[in-house]
Design a protein with these regions (language model features):
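Intrinsically disordered, low-structural-confidence terminal and linker regions
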Residues: 1-31
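Glycine-rich hexapeptide-repeat left-handed beta-helix
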Residues: 3-13, 64, 69-71, 75, ...
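An extended acidic
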Residues: 25-27, 32-66
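Short, T/G/N/S-enriched strand-turn elements that build extracellular solenoid repeat scaffolds
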Residues: 98-100, 117, 204-209
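Residue-level signal for inorganic ion chemistry
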Residues: 109, 217
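Active-site pocket-lining segments that scaffold enzyme catalytic pockets across diverse folds
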Residues: 202, 218
Length: 409
């Protein structure tokens, strides 16, 4: 992911990361550095000779300097490739942290120049790229042959086997038009082979703080991840569109550029497209959230949520394919409120610009694709039906007194 591009290619970034590792030249610690490591810097290793600690001298042909005094109080397990030098790392807009590795356990890692790594319980099978910050974390690890959330099947609509799309980090919402109109083609095996890896990646200028577990995850450049739990996922980010994750729980999912995911929210088997927002304990499962849509407080399950939708209240959206978006969901709306007593084999197709009022109940099956920009009044229970009247107000029947003008009632 080129940091200067607004939406850089994830596929290219993973390939470049692999080639960068392949280009590394390294050496062993000198006798002077070894004495400093053991006595002055108080480092330890499972190998008493520290032969498992390798000092990076070149990356992509560029010579790298090493300062042994910047590595203190660490434990090294298996092969660790280091390159630290005196300097500073930007932390936010007005704070800088010293470049160093301190009080951390590292196992089978690559640490690139000018990083701040401190107070971490265990970092293993991880690539930490230039100008990154990793501090106060529990465990950062990676499984063998991980795909980082790519290829996970997202089942939307009919929960017994509806619209099934394998999500990938480079899947844009415009690309979904073909995928939703026909059975999606299988994934290109070469795409998955190119991104498959054995290492977590923390991209350049990224910051990871106080996370209990980061497992089999790619964190893109300029991303900021705080107090979160992330497993088998990818967090895309760039200098122009940084992604921020705070107090989140993310499993088998992909967050694209500019996403804000915070306030105790959680998602699983989902794709959050660029510039989506998730907050206030929102729950997202088996769903695709289109660009510029916000999910807050509510539950979204097995749904395709189109662009520019306001979903900011305690409400429920289940098994809905809202292709064109641009609508709103009011407080207490239950979209998918009935159950047949059998399998959950029904779905809803809202039209563009639909407005679901406070406390409405939408029973399935429901098709409103040909009723764009219609309003469901507050407290209405909409029985299973197909609506084909655009710009409608759907309300309960009212009784008029012929002797009084309706305007005065």
């Amino acid at each position: 992911m080129e940091p200067d591009l607004p939406y850089p290619s994830y596929h290219d970034y993973m390939r470049n990361c692999s080639s960068q590792i392949a280009s590394i030249s390294y050496r062993q610690l000198t006798d002077v550095e070894l004495r400093q490591f053991q006595s002055f810097c108080l480092n330890q290793s499972t190998d008493k000779t520290f032969s498992n600690v390798h000092i990076i001298t070149r990356i992509n042909g560029q010579e790298i300097r090493f300062d042994p005094h910047s590595v203190t109080g660490c434990l090294f397990i298996d092969d660790v490739y280091l390159c630290t030098s005196s300097g500073f790392v930007n932390y936010g807009s007005d704070i800088v942290l010293p470049s160093m590795i301190r009080n951390s356990t590292l196992r089978n890692c690559y640490v690139f120049p000018n990083c701040h790594i401190s107070q971490n319980a265990l970092i293993e099978n991880t690539i930490i790229q230039t100008n990154s910050i990793v501090m106060g974390c529990g465990r950062i690890t990676c499984c063998k042959h991980s795909l980082f959330g790519n290829g996970v099947i997202c089942n939307m609509g009919n929960e017994t086997g509806g619209l099934q799309i394998p999500i990938t980090a480079d899947l844009l919402y415009n690309d979904l038009e073909d995928a939703t109109s026909m059975k999606p083609p299988p994934l290109d095996p070469s795409y998955l082979d190119d991104i498959r890896g054995d290492y977590c990646v923390i991209g350049p200028n990224a910051a990871v703080e106080m996370c209990s577990l980061i497992d089999s995850t790619v964190i893109g450049p300029f991303a900021h991840v705080v107090s979160s739990h992330i497993v088998n996922s990818s967090v895309l980010s760039s200098h122009c569109n940084p992604t921020k994750v705070t107090s989140g729980d993310i499993i088998d999912s992909i967050l694209q550029w500019g996403t804000v995911f915070e306030s105790g929210s959680n998602c699983a088997q989902s794709l959050l497209c660029e510039h989506t927002t998730t907050s206030c304990n929102a729950k997202i499962v088996n769903s695709i959230i289109a660009p510029n849509t916000g999910v807050s407080s509510g539950e979204c399950n097995s749904s395709l949520v189109g662009p520019f939708i306001g979903f900011h209240h305690n409400s429920v959206l289940i098994s809905a394919l809202w292709f064109y978006g641009k609508g709103n969901i009011g407080y207490g709306a239950n979209i998918g409120s009935n159950h047949t007593g059998r399998l959950p084999d029904q779905e809803c197709l809202p039209g563009e610009g639909m407005f679901f009022g406070l406390g409405c109940n939408i029973k399935y099956p429901c098709n409103m694709l040909k009723a764009p920009y219609s309003l469901i009044a507050s407290g209405i229970t909409l029985l299973p039906q197909k609506v084909e009247m655009p710009f409608s107000l759907i309300n309960k029947p009212s009784v008029n007194d012929s002797s009084v003008s309706p305007a005065y009632k």
